[in-house]
């Protein structure tokens, strides 16, 4: 387990799935965690289980004032900012590209792209102001490195996240700030579990498209994210870590 004792990390989308698993592992690794979500009940439940090492802040990452407030509240609560896991996103049910409405396309871009940009912007500014050599991890997706049929707006958004990650790494390496992307394959999140409960064929299909023969559990993604956030990955920046069971290898 990575040692993050005394470090302060923001986790967006921290109320469930990969985000929740990452909060739990960060706390176990000694970090203070600012848990951000739009689901107050879920976010507060994560904090209640943290043993006093986490605080919940409501944040819609597509809203600039929310993101600015999240960073300010984190600094006020914990006295610094050492890293961030920008994990909040909105996946959507599959549609052929020409059937995607402009409203749906814009929603994907607002949350997945603009939200990630805003989070990085204010996290980086806070780190530079304090001279912190921090680490930022953005959740991309296999959809950020390959084309996934029927998910045009999500593929476009996650490709943008990968591009923003690389540019930020190049821009801010001179400040000692590392920026990387996590590239999960399918993950057993509550949303995916609901979909599998309604479609008996979905789980076998998802197992079949990952060479390792199964899809991921949230804690496996959390382990990858925490490694990237830690000093164990001190020479890793501008990279896409594919924790995808081999999905992008074929």
Curated annotation (Swiss-Prot):
It holds the Pfam family adh_short_C2. Its EC number is 1.1.1.-. The keyword Oxidoreductase applies. Keywords: Detoxification, NAD, Oxidoreductase, Plasmid. GO terms for molecular function: 2,5-dichloro-2,5-cyclohexadiene-1,4-diol dehydrogenase activity. Disulfide bonds: none annotated. NAD(+) binds at residues 9-34. The active site is at residue 154. It catalyses: 2,5-dichlorocyclohexa-2,5-dien-1,4-diol + NAD(+) = 2,5-dichlorohydroquinone + NADH + H(+). Pathway: Xenobiotic degradation; gamma-hexachlorocyclohexane degradation. InterPro entries: NAD(P)-bd_dom_sf (IPR036291), Sc_DH/Rdtase_CS (IPR020904), SDR_fam (IPR002347). CDD domains: SDR_c (cd05233). One of its GO terms (biological process) is response to toxic substance. Substrate binds at residue 141. Belongs to the short-chain dehydrogenases/reductases (SDR) family. NCBIfam families: PRK07231.1. PANTHER family: DEHYDROGENASES, SHORT CHAIN (PTHR24321), ESTRADIOL 17-BETA-DEHYDROGENASE 8-RELATED (PTHR24321:SF8). Catalyzes the dehydrogenation of 2,5-dichloro-2,5-cyclohexadiene-1,4-diol (2,5-DDOL) to 2,5-dichlorohydroquinone (2,5-DCHQ), a step in the degradation of gamma-hexachlorocyclohexane (gamma-HCH or lindane). This is 2,5-dichloro-2,5-cyclohexadiene-1,4-diol dehydrogenase. It comes from Sphingobium indicum (strain DSM 16412 / CCM 7286 / MTCC 6364 / B90A).
């Amino acid at each position: 387990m990575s040692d993050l004792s005394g470090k302060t990390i923001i986790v967006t989308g921290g109320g469930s799935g990969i985000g929740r698993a990452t909060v739990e592992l960060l706390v176990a690794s000694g970090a203070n965690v600012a848990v951000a979500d739009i689901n107050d009940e879920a976010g507060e439940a994560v904090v209640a289980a943290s043993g006093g090492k986490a605080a919940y802040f409501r944040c819609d990452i597509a809203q600039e004032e929310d993101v600015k407030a999240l960073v300010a509240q984190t600094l006020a609560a914990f006295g610094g900012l050492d890293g961030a896991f920008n994990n909040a996103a909105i996946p959507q049910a599959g549609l052929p590209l020409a059937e995607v409405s402009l409203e749906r396309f814009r929603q994907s871009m607002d949350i997945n792209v603009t939200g990630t940009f805003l989070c990085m912007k204010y996290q980086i500014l806070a780190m530079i102001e304090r001279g912190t050599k921090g680490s930022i991890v953005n959740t991309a997706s296999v959809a950020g490195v390959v084309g996934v049929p029927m998910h045009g707006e999500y593929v476009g958004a996650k490709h943008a996240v990968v591009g923003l990650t690389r540019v930020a790494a190049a821009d801010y390496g001179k400040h000692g700030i590392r920026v990387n992307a996590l590239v999960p394959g399918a993950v057993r999140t509550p949303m995916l579990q609901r979909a599998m409960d309604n479609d008996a064929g979905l789980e076998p299909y998802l197992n079949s498209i990952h060479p390792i023969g199964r899809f991921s559990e949230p804690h496996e993604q959390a382990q990858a994210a925490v490694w990237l956030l830690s000093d164990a990955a001190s020479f890793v920046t501008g990279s896409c870590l594919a924790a995808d069971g081999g999905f992008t290898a074929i």
